[in-house]
Amino acid sequence: MTVNETKGSYPMSDVNVPTVKLNDGVEMPTLGFGVFQVPDLSQAEQAVTDALNTGYRLIDTATAYQNEKAVGKTIAKSSVKRDDIFVTSKLWVSDFNYDQAKKGIDASLQKLGLNYIDLYLLHQPYGKVDEAWRALEEAQKAGKIRSIGGFQHDAKALEEVDAELQRHPSR
């Protein structure tokens, strides 16, 4: 496995949260808050506000969750510095071709109101994964995404991506 445990920690209020170092060197908190199944934007905003106030510093969302805008709005209003919040989002399978993936990445950034996303994942291993991955690589090179990876992908699917592409999935 290419995730390395580190002795580092992520700023989380008074709590010392361990981090893992992804294979590209990016440090990710091991504890996070996800907003899956919270499509009501006001509820999502309140949930993320409460999570940040409680000390969570990893926030997980996705295009399919339909709440990226609420997550971004909450981050913008928060007293927590952006650099102290690790944001994960995911590209949905309907955008798994090169052109749609590029548009999907930009749409996530726009909805979140962020200059970059810390970790951007391919949500599921269906469709033109190779084309979507190429778009993620380009976005990473452009500074729009810090780390890229796959979500709900088994080891075989990640190995296939690994063998064909320039940048390896974060694991």
Predicted regions and their residues:
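Intrinsic low-complexity, intrinsically disordered segments enriched in polar/basic residues
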Residues: T2-G8, Q166, S170-R171
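N-terminal binding-site loop/beta-alpha segment at the start of enzyme catalytic domains
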Residues: V3-I85, K141
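Short active-site-adjacent helix-start/loop capping segments
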Residues: E68-K69, D95-N97
